[in-house]
Amino acid sequence: MAAVKCKPTSPGRRHVVKVVNPELHKGKPFAPLLEKNSKSGGRNNNGRITTRHIGGGHKQAYRIVDFKRNKDGIPAVVERLEYDPNRSANIALVLYKDGERRYILAPKGLKAGDQIQSGVDAAIKPGNTLPMRNIPVGSTVHNVEMKPGKGGQLARSAGTYVQIVARDGAYVTLRLRSGEMRKVEADCRATLGEVGNAEHMLRVLGKAGAARWRGVRPTVRGTAMNPVDHPHGGGEGRNFGKHPVTPWGVQTKGKKTRSNKRTDKFIVRRRSK
């Protein structure tokens, strides 16, 4: 896998950096694990915009990814690695010994032909999934559950991982990439290793059109709007002189947004960035 800078054959190609992975499958995805994925355009069921800057983009099929990894005791072989347009990480198509196929997140170093397994008896190697009470302290893991049996929710993006720093009875303490340290039940599952495709962060789209292909619409500055459209709008010239806020008047810098007090007790240390 490598980051390749394109030749400047046009203004739109001049700054493009692509991530090339020759190990990815070049054919079609596995059809039984595909679902229709309708675009919302950022609108809710009333047709009102609830998330700005979303719309258009190429049609995509959703790949049904197994985040629970609950097929215990049955070994599986990695058939191939695939691109997934719905996430930054690549996915792997695995064939279980009983004939079932599933998609999983592709960890760093996983390749076609490798064997993986889930359950308490699985070996300690990248790609295997175990309850965190059975994983050595100090290990890096990904696809981490926050409730037993719910499926992985933490560390699913390309290049991410979580480190197990302590185990205390029914809980393990995790260090997240943000710097936050939090407790999770020791029976929650996690997959060993870090998510692959870490070079994703080196990608440069190079032109506005590449963002539009991905369904991302332009972001207009508040100072460029009229007073009716934004609190920063209006004025002669480029005067600002206010605390920056959202279009609805909520502070944008430093305002706390977390409201889930029920789980505050599990956070040992707040995030540092």
From Swiss-Prot:
Which GO biological process categories is it annotated with? cytoplasmic translation
Instruction: Tell me which residues bear N6-acetyllysine.
Output: K242
Give the source species.
Shigella dysenteriae serotype 1 (strain Sd197)
Q: Which UniProt keywords apply?
A: Acetylation, Ribonucleoprotein, Ribosomal protein, RNA-binding, rRNA-binding
Q: Which gene encodes it?
A: rplB
Q: Which Pfam families match?
A: Ribosomal_L2, Ribosomal_L2_C
| Protein family per UniProt | Belongs to the universal ribosomal protein uL2 family.
GO cellular component terms attached to this protein's record: cytosol; large ribosomal subunit
The upper taxonomy is: Bacteria, Pseudomonadati, Pseudomonadota, Gammaproteobacteria, Enterobacterales
Q: Which InterPro entries match?
A: NA-bd_OB-fold, Rib_uL2_dom2, Ribosomal_uL2, Ribosomal_uL2_bac/org-type, Ribosomal_uL2_C, Ribosomal_uL2_CS, Ribosomal_uL2_dom3, Ribosomal_uL2_RNA-bd_dom
Question: Which SMART domains would you find in this protein's record?
Answer: Ribosomal_L2 (SM01383), Ribosomal_L2_C (SM01382)
Skewed-composition ranges (Low complexity): 39-48
Instruction: List the NCBIfam families hit by this protein, alphabetically.
Output: rplB_bact
Top-level taxon in the UniProt lineage:
Bacteria
Q: Where is this region: Disordered?
A: 28-53, 221-273
UniProt xrefs under HAMAP family: Ribosomal_uL2_B
**Protein task:** One of the primary rRNA binding proteins. Required for association of the 30S and 50S subunits to form the 70S ribosome, for tRNA binding and peptide bond formation. It has been suggested to have peptidyltransferase activity; this is somewhat controversial. Makes several contacts with the 16S rRNA in the 70S ribosome.
- PROSITE patterns noted in UniProt: RIBOSOMAL_L2 (PS00467)
Give the protein's recorded name: Large ribosomal subunit protein uL2
GO terms, molecular function:
rRNA binding; structural constituent of ribosome; transferase activity
Please describe the quaternary structure of this protein. Part of the 50S ribosomal subunit. Forms a bridge to the 30S subunit in the 70S ribosome.
